Design a protein with these regions (language model features):
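Positively charged n-region of N-terminal signal peptides that target proteins for export
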Residues: 1-4, 265
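Zinc-dependent metalloendopeptidases
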Residues: 16-264
Length: 265
């Protein structure tokens, strides 16, 4: 019996550590984040720029804007005809993003995009005032996107949007932010996805303190995934909470030993 209760703090503290945070960013300052679409050619990916806009809107509504515990709201403001990221590497493309926004586009010139299994990537940067991000899908002639269904492409887009607003990868396959979607259709968010979005953009700031690549979506965004030090700290806190819970339960059981002995028989 004591052995069972000793497991409680370990089990309790293990539930919330699947998501990681992009240390280069840590989230936008504002819960309401606009997504602008660059007026770049997406034909290599198998769709028009207009269709790309629709896919992003659908991805936003079907995934991230549907998290009830998160205050994050992503608004697709449409195609900005004055922005074109064709020919740009990420370092140049992100300079075209407005502060506090995500710029989404297609490109066949990013160095790693000659590998068709790399479907896209996202980069975020912050300074003393605010953050901005750029999301680019692979529109190279070799891109595997042209062979994917709309549902799969929306999952790819939603995955990269997750990076763009501050999430890293999850190690568990049932989550959208798992490092490889492997061509499957991810129709919903997993618990790590939900916890990560809630941690970064909670309705109540106090709630955050209680929470404890893809083919391949390759992480070429130079993410330094934060999780080691913070995860250890959160693990210790939650372990102690679990220990207190197990102590309370054990005390209750011992004080009612006769009843529980009859029950266990």
């Amino acid at each position: 019996m004591k052995f069972i209760f000793l497991l409680i703090p370990f089990i309790y503290s293990s539930f919330v550590f699947g998501f990681t945070i992009n240390q280069d960013m840590g989230g936008f300052d504002n819960n309401n984040v606009n997504i602008e679409i660059a007026n770049s050619d997406c034909s290599g990916a198998g769709f028009s720029t207009s269709k790309y806009s629709t896919l992003i809107k659908d991805a936003v509504e079907e995934y991230w804007n549907s998290v009830p515990t998160s205050a994050l709201y992503l608004k697709v403001v449409g195609i900005n005809t004055s922005i074109d990221i064709d020919g740009d590497q990420f370092s140049a493309a992100i300079n075209k993003a407005k502060t506090g926004t995500i710029l989404a586009g297609c490109n066949d010139d990013v160095t790693d995009f000659t590998d068709g299994s790399i479907l896209g990537a996202a980069v975020a940067t912050c300074d003393s005032s605010a953050c901005k991000s750029v999301l680019i899908l692979n529109a190279h002639a070799n891109s595997s996107l042209k062979n994917m269904s709309d549902s799969e492409i929306k999952a790819v887009i939603a995955h990269e949007i997750g990076h763009a607003f501050g999430l890293g990868h999850s190690e568990y396959k049932h989550n959208l932010m798992y490092y490889s979607i492997g061509g499957k259709t991810q129709k919903w968010l997993g618990i790590d996805d939900i916890d990560g979005a809630t941690y970064l953009y909670p309705h109540d700031a106090e709630i955050a303190g209680l929470l404890g690549s893809c083919g391949t979506i390759k992480d070429i965004s130079k993410h330094k995934l934060k999780g080691s030090n913070n995860s250890i700290f959160r693990f210790l806190i939650l372990f102690l909470i679990g220990l207190l819970i197990s102590k309370f339960i054990l005390k209750t059981v011992l004080s009612n030993r006769d009843f529980f002995n009859k029950f266990m028989k």
